[in-house]
Amino acid sequence: MSISLTTKLSYGFGAFGKDFAIGIVYMYLMYYYTDVVGLSVGLVGTLFLVARIWDAINDPIMGWIVNATRSRWGKFKPWILIGTLTNSLVLFLLFSAHLFEGTAQVVFVCVTYILWGMTYTIMDIPFWSLVPTITLDKREREQLVPFPRFFASLAGFVTAGITLPFVSYVGGADRGFGFQMFTLVLIAFFIASTIVTLRNVHEVYSSDNGVTAGRPHLTLKTIVGLIYKNDQLSCLLGMALAYNIASNIINGFAIYYFTYVIGDADLFPYYLSYAGAANLLTLIVFPRLVKMLSRRILWAGASVMPVLSCAGLFAMALADIHNAALIVAAGIFLNIGTALFWVLQVIMVADTVDYGEFKLNIRCESIAYSVQTMVVKGGSAFAAFFIALVLGLIGYTPNVAQSAQTLQGMQFIMIVLPVLFFMMTLVLYFRYYRLNGDMLRKIQIHLLDKYRKTPPFVEQPDSPAISVVATSDVKA
């Protein structure tokens, strides 16, 4: 049975509210902390680094907790609701730091930021873990996933466009109050969209059903071992890490490249101007693309398009050409590639969940998506590390004309490093990734037959609302 439009739109609306709420943190929290609250850049940078390290530990543990959950509402929906409500509260507190001073302010900022990351993880992991439970059909997933990816991207563009005007209009000179009030708008959308998702999106092929209900719960140590035994998940994580490092290097370093190498920072907005539209358009036409082209071709496109973007920027720098149209084209190529990557990645993680059940007879949706989330955050951290390392090695000095050697080093950061990582994703995919064509069809047929033989699992009415099975292995 095909997925209804109501399900697709409800899942997409949930992604909109979720990313509407997170967008203000990714885009404006640094500005809020430094320019509104008055914290030092060093303190904020250290806090962000510590939070990413904690995420690397926290995300898989949260995935394990979700995987061990059994409830009358399924294994994911309770955590989506809990995560939404707690993250909404913490989001409001996050932008209330301007109300404190001195040591109390620093402590408040550190505690609320760490709590924000933890509560968002509670919601985000089970939200994306719904994908492999909605359908086992390859084509249906390819029709489903563009909806949440499109709405998530749209939320980011809306956040970028309306945040500062809202803050100025409502807060006036008191920007802290403006930010605080804007979080209430975000929270309203966040909670409303989550309710729509919970009402209309259903777990059909979850590991919390009659097929797996009688199996013993897995310890955290066993779960970590299963990640390595699922060779296709390991391969996908390697590809995702390489891709995220490359794209984060470009996103984080582009302003430096335009300022010093191309020599005109005013051209940077052209690089971004049509990129968002290209991203959204790619997500809209993805269902048609995947009918016309194989996933192998689309993955190649996801990796090659950003390489062409880098090559275009490199050629303009060498020829000393300042052409807005070429810069717009470079931004479009980059965003077409990244849009393809993000939608393919979500689908492919779902495929590795099916593969794990096919090969190991164990279905762990939340574990797969938790380690995928960890890899995305790791990619951001590694990218920042590479940028800082190379800038130090090449003798970069801010706000002055750079030497020829430094400019060459900047080209290495912006062009060579990303291209190497993008090429790595291609090599890993075509050499080691096998979940395509006949292999995927074989897995789908096997699992459909398996789930048809066992009716959906239903909790008894008198069972506990949420039961998380703990084990002595949690420290593993």
Curated annotation (Swiss-Prot):
SUPFAM superfamilies: MFS general substrate transporter. Changing residue 377 to C: Inhibits Na(+)- and Li(+)-coupled activity, with little effect on H(+)-coupled melibiose transport. Gene3D superfamilies: MFS general substrate transporter like domains (1.20.1250.20). Mediates the transport of melibiose and other galactosides by a symport mechanism. Can use sodium, lithium and protons as coupling cations, with a preference for sodium and lithium. The use of Na(+) as coupling ion for sugar transport is based not on ion selectivity but on competitive binding under physiological conditions, because of a much higher Na(+) concentration under physiological conditions. Changing residue 120 to C: Loss of transporter activity. Apoprotein is apparently conformationally labile and readily converts to different states, including inward-facing conformations for substrate access. Contains a conserved cation-binding pocket, which directly connects to the sugar specificity pocket. The chain crosses the membrane at residues 8-30, 42-66, 77-97, 105-129, 144-167, 178-200, 233-255, 267-289, 297-318, 324-349, 367-394, 409-431. It comes from Salmonella typhimurium (strain LT2 / SGSC1412 / ATCC 700720). Keywords: Cell inner membrane, Cell membrane, Membrane, Sugar transport, Symport, Transmembrane, Transmembrane helix, Transport. It catalyses: melibiose(in) + Na(+)(in) = melibiose(out) + Na(+)(out); melibiose(in) + Li(+)(in) = melibiose(out) + Li(+)(out); melibiose(in) + H(+)(in) = melibiose(out) + H(+)(out). This is Melibiose permease. Residues 31-41, 98-104, 168-177, 256-266, 319-323, 395-408 are periplasmic. It is found in: Cell inner membrane. GO terms for molecular function: symporter activity. One of its GO terms (cellular component) is plasma membrane. It comes from the Bacteria. Binding of Na(+) and melibiose is cooperative, the binding affinity for one substrate is increased by the presence of the other. With binding of one substrate (either Na(+) or melibiose), MelB favors open conformations (likely outward facing), whereas the cooperative binding of both substrates induces cavity closure. Thus, cooperative binding is the key that regulates the alternating-access process and ensures the obligatory cotransport as the core mechanism for symport. Melibiose uptake is inhibited by valinomycin. CDD domains: MFS_MelB_like. Pfam families: MFS_2. Belongs to the sodium:galactoside symporter (TC 2.A.2) family. GO terms for biological process: carbohydrate transport; sodium ion transport; transmembrane transport. InterPro entries: MFS_2, MFS_trans_sf, Na/Gal_symport, Na/Gal_symport_CS. PANTHER family: MAJOR FACILITATOR SUPERFAMILY DOMAIN-CONTAINING PROTEIN, MELIBIOSE PERMEASE. Residues 1-7, 67-76, 130-143, 201-232, 290-296, 350-366, 432-476 are cytoplasmic.
